[in-house]
Design a protein with these regions (language model features):
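Short regulatory "switch" loops immediately downstream of catalytic or recognition motifs
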Residues: 165, 442-443, 545
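Generic low-complexity, intrinsically disordered sequence content enriched
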Residues: 286, 534, 541-543
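Glycine-rich N-terminal segment of FAD-binding domains in flavoprotein oxidoreductases
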Residues: 147
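Intrinsically disordered, low-complexity segments enriched in serine/proline and basic residues
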Residues: 542-565
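Glycine-rich, acidic/polar active-site loops that bind/position phosphate-bearing ligands
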Residues: 1-143, 152-155, 162-399
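C-terminal amphipathic alpha-helical interaction region
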Residues: 337-537
Length: 565
């Protein structure tokens, strides 16, 4: 933050601001999370050990109807949210909004913006408080990036802007951004910073859980790009082609045609939720950060890479003899050299992946692929130049990240083996035995009666059981091999290339078996059980009936309750 402030003040001085002494990074983190019933949670060892479900077939109803997002908040969840807000405000955390998110049982909480370091600490407190308050309500708050397959995962949108201590927002384009040279210079520096350090920015959001979320047609892709919207994209195109922008697209007015309703002003910008780094009015929104992670890493990277771009711009312009000419030239140069990172289209599409490859943009689909960016020469030079990290500190962090990935994956693999061996396979064996017994009894009782259904189920179940057993054996061998690797980077790489595919191979047949095996036999709550509307214990009536015991009359208080599903 200090490095960013120093370089941003240099930019302000170039435009005649002699009053501002500091520029602060203002941050607001939108925290997403899932809420499940604690009673059901305790029956899922994968949720307890890893924070996510390692097995689970899709529920009949997911998020297809799009009826969860901003829908009515369920009463029990609403009481949890109200209690959470009270606890947060007691600590000075200004929680201001809460709503349902896209997936069933998914929600969001967001605070009022704070200075970056304060926002980071408050977000850590928020996550801890969420878990504590949820327990108080008989619930569990899941902060994992992908607790359930097949529906949206959870992220943490990191909204950030640059504000001087005199109250000026450096990212406010004004009504005519084409004439706002200070804003255009700041914008061009951000574009330059993100393009030059896209791999480092991707690394800042890398965590094992995000490997399950990013690029899954629900969250930002693993490819870093910037969305500017129609208005600013038009200004950038004019600058790239002509050196300056003569005008800009203006917002329109929406006339509903109803005399009793006012005419509505339309914003000149638009939204693109498929972009990982989007300009939204007067701020940028970095959407890659995982829901369980601290926002410190991403904001440290953003602050430093933007500070570097500001420093280079100030070095050039402070020597200028014709400031207006040179600032226009520098803005055009930055935008021309780094426009490849600008993209307003669908970030989920395969066409974008192909286009990004043609543009030379890095595509780092997993954590292990992203970690090396932390120790690249350009990264080390930048962090050391601004006194943020030394080379030794970056190498240490790199080792910790590799170790974290390897240990997390190993825990998930061992949990899968435990659940498969102790829960799923024994349950399926009991089911096949029941089918076989049914076939024998039907044939004995009535040879003419058909047993085709039982035989088909037995055959299909037996085949899937064999696949699961073989996959279990392969995963056991992979885990044993992993245990013999000493180098943490090699171990993490093996986990990505060997353990994770073996885990998928074990999950596939067991998820299919879940759709076949009798629910009474299935050993754990299903996705439908976990994500159904969180039950609410309703007190119906408390009464004191008289119970006769011979000549004596005893009074007892009886509470009748039921759980709404």
């Amino acid at each position: 933050m200090q490095a960013l402030s120093q370089q941003a003040v240099r930019i302000l001085r170039l435009f005649g601001d002699q009053e501002s002494q500091r520029v602060l990074l203002s941050v607001g983190a939108e925290q997403e999370y899932f809420i499940v019933d604690r009673e059901r949670y305790l029956k899922r060892r994968d949720l307890i050990y890893t924070g996510r479900t390692l097995f689970g077939a899709p529920a009949p109803k997911g998020q297809e109807l799009e009826d969860q997002y901003f829908g009515v908040i369920r009463e029990r969840v609403g009481e949890f949210m109200a209690d959470l807000n009270t606890e947060l405000w007691k600590m000075g955390i200004t929680a201001t909004t809460q709503h349902n998110e896209v997936a069933p049982a998914q929600h969001e909480s967001a605070p009022i913006y704070s200075t970056c370091n304060v926002a980071v600490d408050q977000n850590q407190l928020t996550m801890e408080t969420m878990k504590r308050v949820a327990t108080r309500h008989g619930l569990v708050c899941l902060l994992h990036e992908k607790p359930f397959a097949g529906v949206n995962g959870s992220g943490k949108h990191n909204n950030w802007s640059l504000n001087s201590d005199t109250g000026e927002n450096l990212l406010d384009p004004g009504t005519t951004p084409n004439d706002n040279l200070q804003f255009l210079l700041v914008l061009s520096c951000v574009i330059k910073a993100v393009d030059r350090h896209a791999d480092l920015l991707r690394m800042s959001a890398a965590c094992p859980g995000n490997d399950q979320r990013l690029g899954a047609d629900e969250a930002p892709p693993a490819i870093i790009s910037i969305f500017l919207g129609n208005q600013l994209s038009d200004v950038v195109n004019q600058i790239v082609e002509n050196g300056t922008a003569a005008g800009c697209i203006e917002g329109g007015r929406l006339d509903t045609g109803v005399s009793t309703l006012p005419v509505i002003d339309q914003d000149a910008t638009d939204r693109n939720r498929t972009s990982p780094f989007a300009f939204t009015g007067n701020k940028f929104e970095f959407r890659m950060v995982g829901s369980s992670e601290s926002i410190a890493n991403s904001n440290t990277v953003i602050s430093t890479i933007v500070a570097e771009a500001f420093c280079e711009a100030a070095d050039v312009l402070e020597k200028s003899e014709n400031f207006e000419r040179d600032v226009n030239l520098l803005i055009a140069e930055n935008m021309r050299n780094h426009r490849r990172v600008l993209f307003n289209g669908n970030g989920y599409s395969e066409e974008w992946r192909q286009e990004a490859a043609r543009r030379g943009l890095p595509n780092l689909p997993n954590m292990v692929s992203a970690i090396p960016a932390l120790t690249e020469e350009k990264t080390v030079e930048m962090f050391e130049k601004f006194g943020v990290f030394t080379k030794a500190e970056l190498e240490s962090r790199s080792e910790v990240l590799y170790e974290t990935y390897a240990k997390t994956t190993a825990i998930e693999a061992r949990t899968m083996l435990h659940m498969a061996g102790k829960h799923y396979i024994p349950a399926v064996v009991r089911y096949t035995a029941r089918l076989a017994d049914s076939i024998c009894k039907v044939r004995s009782a009535c040879p003419e009666a058909g047993t085709g259904v039982q035989e088909r189920l037995l055959k299909e179940t037996g085949e899937l059981l064999a696949q699961a057993s073989e996959a279990q054996k392969c995963l056991e061998e992979a885990v044993e091999k992993m245990n013999n690797i000493d180098n943490v980077r090699e171990m993490a790489t093996f986990c990505r290339d060997g353990i994770v595919p073996a885990m998928r191979a074990l999950r596939t047949p067991i998820d299919r078996l879940e759709l076949i095996v009798d629910k009474a036999i299935w050993p754990v709550p299903t996705y439908g059980d976990l994500r159904v509307e969180v039950g609410y214990l309703l007190l119906i009536k408390t009464f004191r009936p008289k119970i006769s015991e011979g000549k004596k009359v005893r009074k007892e208080t009886v509470t009748v309750s039921f759980r709404v599903q």
